[in-house]
């Protein structure tokens, strides 16, 4: 390909002939300290063992290098990072919308959904929207939010409870209780 840019592979660690130091602090396969040796000598030792010389800490004086199987090292590193990602729980905020005049049947359905969200470990955002003349009856809206809060007292803790109306809505945020 004419005039194309070459893609250069960059490794997180320099290995074997990529190491630029004259002397290195060498550690063995099991992590035992060998000492400060000449780079050629360190490369020779790693070749004898059939392993790679990997620069672990390039900013140290002299740089710290370790004799190891670099492919295996990268595999173990990626495996451990995948394990850490698996253990992380992503918390989503699920939203349920109420109105001041939400009827009993609808209220129960929405409450059931809130319970499901909280049991799954997600946060819940309860939005209470006012329309038209409902703005004059904000107390009814606060009563609805208090009812939701009291119905979910065993499952959730209130992270945010509105002190006043924001625009045409009130928002309450619930977080699941720690088990």
Curated annotation (Swiss-Prot):
Q: Name one GO biological process term.
A: ribosome disassembly
What UniProt keywords apply to this chain's record, in alphabetical order?
Cytoplasm, Initiation factor, Protein biosynthesis
- Which Pfam family, just one, is annotated for this protein? IF3_C
Recorded hits in PROSITE patterns, A to Z, give: IF3 (PS00938)
Q: Which PANTHER family match?
A: TRANSLATION INITIATION FACTOR IF-3 (PTHR10938), TRANSLATION INITIATION FACTOR IF-3, MITOCHONDRIAL (PTHR10938:SF0)
What function does the entry list? IF-3 binds to the 30S ribosomal subunit and shifts the equilibrium between 70S ribosomes and their 50S and 30S subunits in favor of the free subunits, thus enhancing the availability of 30S subunits on which protein synthesis initiation begins.
Protein name, as recorded: Translation initiation factor IF-3
Its ancestry begins with: Bacteria, Pseudomonadati, Pseudomonadota, Gammaproteobacteria, Enterobacterales
What is this protein's gene name? infC
């Amino acid at each position: 390909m004419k005039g194309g840019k070459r893609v250069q592979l960059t490794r997180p660690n320099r290995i074997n002939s990529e190491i630029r130091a004259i002397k290195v602090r060498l550690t063995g396969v099991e992590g035992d300290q060998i000492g400060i040796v000449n780079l050629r000598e360190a490369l020779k030792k790693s070749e004898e063992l059939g392993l790679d010389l990997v620069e672990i800490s390039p900013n140290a004086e002299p740089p710290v290098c370790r004799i190891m199987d670099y492919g295996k090292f990268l595999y173990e590193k990626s495996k451990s990072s995948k394990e850490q990602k698996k253990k992380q729980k992503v918390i989503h905020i699920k939203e349920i919308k109420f109105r001041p005049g939400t009827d009993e049947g609808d209220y129960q359905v929405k409450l059931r959904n809130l319970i499901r969200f909280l049991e799954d470990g997600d946060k819940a955002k309860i939005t209470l929207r006012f329309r038209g003349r409902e703005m004059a009856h904000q107390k009814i809206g606060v009563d609805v939010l208090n009812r939701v809060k009291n119905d979910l007292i065993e499952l959730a803790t209130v992270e945010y409870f509105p002190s006043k109306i924001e625009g045409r809505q009130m928002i309450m945020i619930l977080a699941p209780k720690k088990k």
